[in-house]
Amino acid sequence: NGDPVGIACAMKNAGVGVGIPDWGRCKLIVEADEKVHIYSGASCIGQGLGTVLVQVVVTNTGLHRDNIVYERSNTWIAPDSGDTSGSRQTLVTGEATRRACEKLSAALAGKTLHDLVGQEFYGEYLAKTDPLGADVPNPVSHVAYGYATQMCILDRETGRVKKMVAAHDVGKAVNPLSCEGQIEGGVVMSLGYALTEQYPIDENCKPTAKYGMLGLFRANQIPPEIQAIVVEKPGLNVAGGAIGIGEITSIPTAPAIADAYFRLDGQRRLTLPLENTISDRKSGSAG
């Protein structure tokens, strides 16, 4: 119908990479309640890692969900699994958990959880990569990459973002609904980066604006439609083929929006937030 359309593509590594040790660790303990308790020092900060690890255990042991308990990470009993960054936890800790499941499954042969009370099953995985500049054939900077294409559709009459479409190659979607949520959340975050948010600082990197003046994106500014497309593609031979989908969801959004505005008025916008958009012209919502 003649509405301006912008498109952008991105790629993003999963894991720390570049030769830095990148460990995932997990301990499965059959406790007195005759259930398998999952312990890992990987912080679950909203990305759904706990759900993923439970699914990994159920899938790889055949145990019922009711027999699995995810324990929040702690430094007392949970093995260190690195920080929650770099879109790494589903991959590295997911694989560590899968390896622990192999040991648990072997012990369960001909037995029940009642027979295994008090036993621990440990798994770890090191995502091996090469340092930058390594003099080796075919150096590996990261163990996996995610890919994405996002599209922005503007309403030609109002200049508002009408729809966002985000297609992401996630390898294997352990939890498809969670993947969609990650995509939608990342798009909304980047809509803020693109259209409204600023974080001004002085020459000493001290913030110069109050929190309420940062232009944080609000719920009533979200576009009418965000379409998340989860693309599954085999290839990775660890963690069931899952590739992290955290940070990449926020990368191509702003460029896609900038491209759409360029097609609307021919102006290239090269700084964030984008200048002379609907959020600048009017006080109404950006979406």
Regions flagged by a language model, labelled:
Residues 1-10, 55-281, 285:
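C-terminal catalytic domains of large/alpha subunits in multi-subunit enzymes
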Residues 1-29:
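Accessory "access/gating" subregions that flank catalytic or transport cores
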Residues 29-33, 155:
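Short beta-strand micro-motifs enriched in acidic
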Residues 32-38, 239-243:
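Glycine/charged-rich beta-loop-alpha catalytic/anionic-binding loops adjacent to active sites
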Residues 35-40, 161-163:
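Short, aliphatic-rich beta-strand segments
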Residues 43:
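Gly/Ser-rich, acidic/histidine-flanked active-site/gating loops
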Residues 50-51:
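Conserved strand-to-helix beginnings and helix N-cap segments that scaffold or border functional pockets
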